[in-house]
């Protein structure tokens, strides 16, 4: 079973952007996060788990009773945004050619500004130029489903604005296959074809 005080769980609490349970301020968290991801491959998963909407709960670390400890600093909205941005930048930088890592980042991208989304997708497009068609299809299909879902439920509170969705759609067009057959394989997905312009749900 999963241990609540495992090293991974402890690191997730320490690097949680919106809950400060240690004496590190936001800038120090970012600095330590960079050092961690440079040294350990598994650190990527720790930081990715702290991206917006991916971590719903956090608990404080136990503090020693035999000595005085530094008090944790209050987190401002500016601090929170800065940490989220730097975590995304670090995870993007170290995503490499791993399609599953890129997929994870795509799933959390809607919480970021348009400019950050554009920057992210430009990096993704450049990275896919060295990917095989199967990996490109994997990522393009994921993006397609996001566009489909938000346009199908466009009246929902959580639906993305059309200007953001256009960034996703343009990314799909910009990722090209070596074999043109891959451009049409999404049409044969069973049960739920991810059309870019579905008839909205009413």
Residue locations for each model-derived region?
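Non-catalytic all-alpha helical scaffold/repeat segments
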Residues: 1-202
């Amino acid at each position: 079973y999963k241990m609540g005080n495992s090293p991974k769980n402890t690191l997730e609490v320490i690097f949680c952007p919106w809950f400060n349970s240690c004496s590190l301020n936001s800038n120090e968290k970012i600095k330590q996060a960079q050092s961690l991801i440079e040294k350990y491959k598994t650190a990527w998963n720790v930081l990715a788990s702290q991206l917006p909407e991916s971590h719903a709960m956090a608990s404080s670390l136990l503090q020693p009773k035999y000595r005085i400890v530094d008090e944790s600093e209050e987190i401002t909205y500016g601090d929170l945004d800065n940490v989220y941005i730097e975590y995304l930048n670090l995870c993007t930088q170290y995503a490499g050619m791993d399609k599953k890592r890129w997929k994870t980042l795509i799933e959390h991208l809607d919480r970021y500004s348009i400019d950050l989304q554009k920057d992210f997708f430009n990096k993704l497009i450049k990275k896919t130029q060295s990917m095989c068609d199967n990996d490109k299809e994997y990522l393009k299909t994921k993006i397609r489903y996001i566009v489909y879902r938000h346009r199908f439920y466009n009246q929902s509170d959580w639906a993305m604005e059309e200007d953001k969705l256009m960034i996703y759609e343009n990314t799909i067009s910009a990722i090209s296959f070596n074999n043109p057959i891959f451009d049409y394989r999404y049409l044969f997905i069973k049960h739920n074809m991810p059309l870019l312009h579905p008839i909205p749900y009413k």
